[in-house]
Amino acid sequence: RIIIGNNVLIRTNVTIYVDTIIHDNCWINHNSIIRENVKILDDSSIGSNTICENNVSIGKRCLIQNNTMICSGSIIESFVFIGPGVTLTNNSPIGHLRDVKPIIRGPKLRLGCAIGGGVTICPGIEIGEESVIAAGSVITENVLPRIIISGNPAQKTKNIGKKGLIKKEIRKKYGF
């Protein structure tokens, strides 16, 4: 079954599969695909032409821009920004598949991180709380909380500081 909350805007040519829950005040924009067992919490927006594979969790007040690929098994916590054309990848073994046991490990994007446009995040990677990934970067290793990284492969540019990116009143309003 599909559960859709109050005040949800679903634009034209969107496909939503079974066992999906979309909470209140969300937007799902044109031509997007939401696969099975996806949960999208309050006040989040999914951009046009975005593909959200199965078994994905998206937190509160996330902004996922156009043409993004969210692979199976991804966890996107609350207040996450994902720029246009971002690709999240999971484990797809290369080589002889007959002897390979499938293991799906999507990335984990922690609270309040910001991902610039055109970024690629490799399987099983964790992006730390309130970190910033510069546009076009390729993320091959876990990212610590509250740092800025850029490049291919991405490397630390600088620290963000203890205040972080999310304002106190916003944290309080949403219970974080």
Feature names for model-found ranges:
Residues Y17, Y174-F176:
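Sequence-level detector for tyrosine residue identity
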Residues R146, I160-Y174:
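A glycine/serine/threonine-rich, flexible loop-to-helix segment
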